[in-house]
Amino acid sequence: MRRGDPPPRAFQAPVDVHASADGQVYMFRHRQEEPEASSEDEELNVMELRPRSRDSSSKEKEGVGEMLLLERDISHEDNLSKLALQYGCKVADIKRVNNLFQEQDMYALKSIKIPVRKHGLLTEAISELRTPQQRPSHDAAPSNSAMASVSGRPQVQEYTNYLKEVDNDIERLIQNTDNVEEVFSASSRVSRGWGWRSQRLRSNGADWGIQWWNAVIAMLLIGIVLPIFYVVYYKTKDSGESAVDNVGVNISVSTSNSTREYNGKSP
C-alpha cells in the first residue's frame, strides 16, 4: 500500500433488505461520487482528445479548400453521369453543388457548376470550364438589371395585375347586364305583340288561365240559368202535349156525333 492511496473499503451491496409486516422492503442506495483521481484522469483524456479533433477539422478544411467550382454551359446531350465521368467527380457532388434533386432538374439551368481539384489538369487543359466570376459581361448585365427591376418593384407589378383583373371583371359584368337588358326588352315586345297570350302565360296553369269573374259567370250559368231553362222547357213541353190530346179528343167526339146524326136522318 503506497502513501497517498485511499484505504480499502469494505464491500457494500447496492440494496439493503428490511423486513416489514407486508413483506420485504428493498432500499437502493445512490452511487457515491468517484474519487478525485478519476476526475483527473478524465481531464487528461479530454486534453489528449482535443488536438485530435483539431487535426481532423483542419484536414477537412484542407480537403474542402482543395476543391474548386467551375461552370460549364449545358447542352442537350449532357447528363450527370457523362459530366461526372468527363471531369472525374461524383454525381452526388454535382447535385449537392447545384441543388439538384433529380437529373431532369439540370435541364432547367443554362450552366452547371462542377467541383474539380484545384491546380489539376482539368482546370488548366479544358477551356470549357470557367469560374463563376468570369461570366460574360453581356449575360451578367441583363441578369443584374432584371434582378434589380424584380426586387425593386414587385408589389407595383402585383397591383397592376390585380387592377387589370378587376377591369376585366367589370367589363364582363357590363356585357352580361347588356345581354340581360336585351333579353328583357325582347320579352316585353313579345308580350305587347301577343296580348292575351302573354296574359295566359302569366297564369300558373292550375286554373287554365281563367280569371275570377269568368269563374263566377260560369257558376251562375251552371247553377241558375241552366236549371231554369230545363224547368221551363219541360213545362212547355208537357202543356203542349196536353193541348194536343184535348184537340184530338174534341175532334173524335165531334166526328162521332156527326156520324150519329147522319145515321138518324137516314131512312
Curated annotation (Swiss-Prot):
UniProt biased composition (Acidic residues): 35-45
Residues covered by the LysM domain: 70-114
Membrane topology according to the record: Single-pass membrane protein
Subcellular localization(s) per the UniProt record: Membrane
Broad class of the protein's primary localization: membrane
Annotated transmembrane regions: 212-232
GO CC list: membrane
Biased composition (Basic and acidic residues): 49-64
Biased composition (Polar residues): 142-152
Residues listed as glycosylation sites in the UniProt record: N79
Topological domains annotated Cytoplasmic: 233-267
Signal sequence interval, chain numbering: none
Side Extracellular, residues: 1-211
Keyword field contains Membrane: yes
Keywords on record: Glycoprotein, Membrane, Transmembrane, Transmembrane helix
Region entry Disordered, spans: 30-64, 130-152
Keyword Transmembrane helix appears in the UniProt entry: yes
PROSITE patterns xref list: LYSM
Protein name, per record: LysM and putative peptidoglycan-binding domain-containing protein 4
Species of provenance: Danio rerio (Zebrafish)
